[in-house]
């Protein structure tokens, strides 16, 4: 059996494009079980405030622990964590703390993500992402051995102003 687990961001739920289409692709690749996490967090002032971001991470991590507590991880032959924004830190921490042998897709990771040393990961980030210093995150990804696809002028949803480049 193959399991895909989606770790959303705070304002980016699992039915938004990056996570929605990624899990559809995972299903096409044979992932026959899916878990979609949901978070409740309503505080403002996270951007640019490491202490507030860490508090949010701690809250979301606790919620993820609760939602994933009944999973029998050894029954799965293959586990894929799809994560977005602060969810990338939650997924990295969860895999590390529980020794989950998984692959990870990290959409728009934060600096905090690489402090948690995600393993078997591939990351995607835009240079115009207001939540991340793209070049600092790129350096952290490199130091962690995580391949990073960096998209010029893409925002926190990996969108650009121009969809057509000629």
Which stretches of residues belong to each language-model region?
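Gly/Ala-rich beta-loop-alpha elbow adjacent to hydrolase catalytic centers
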Residues: 82-91
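Conserved small/polar residues in nucleotide/adenosyl-binding loops
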Residues: 164-166
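Acidic catalytic loop of the alpha/beta-hydrolase fold
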Residues: 128-132
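Short beta-strand/loop motif that positions the catalytic acidic residue
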Residues: 123-125
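Serine-hydrolase catalytic machinery in alpha/beta-hydrolase-like enzymes
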Residues: 2-75
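A conserved short beta-strand
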Residues: 100-109
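Catalytic histidine neighborhood in serine/cysteine hydrolases
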Residues: 33-35, 143-159
């Amino acid at each position: 059996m193959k399991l895909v687990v989606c770790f959303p961001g705070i304002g980016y739920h699992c039915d938004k494009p990056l996570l929605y289409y990624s899990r559809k692709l995972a299903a096409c690749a044979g992932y026959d079980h899916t878990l979609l996490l949901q978070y409740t967090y309503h505080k403002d002032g996270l951007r640019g405030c490491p202490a507030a971001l860490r508090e949010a991470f701690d809250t979301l991590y606790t919620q993820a622990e609760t939602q994933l507590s009944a999973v029998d991880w050894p029954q799965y032959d293959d586990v894929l964590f799809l994560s977005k924004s602060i969810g990338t830190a939650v997924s990295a921490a969860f895999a590390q703390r529980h020794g989950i042998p998984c692959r990870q897709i990290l959409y728009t990771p934060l600096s905090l993500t690489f402090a948690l040393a995600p393993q078997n990961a591939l990351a995607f980030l835009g240079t115009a992402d207001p939540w991340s210093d793209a070049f600092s995150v790129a350096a952290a990804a490199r130091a962690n051995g995580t391949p990073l696809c960096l998209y010029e002028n893409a925002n926190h949803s990996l969108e650009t102003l121009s969809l057509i480049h000629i």
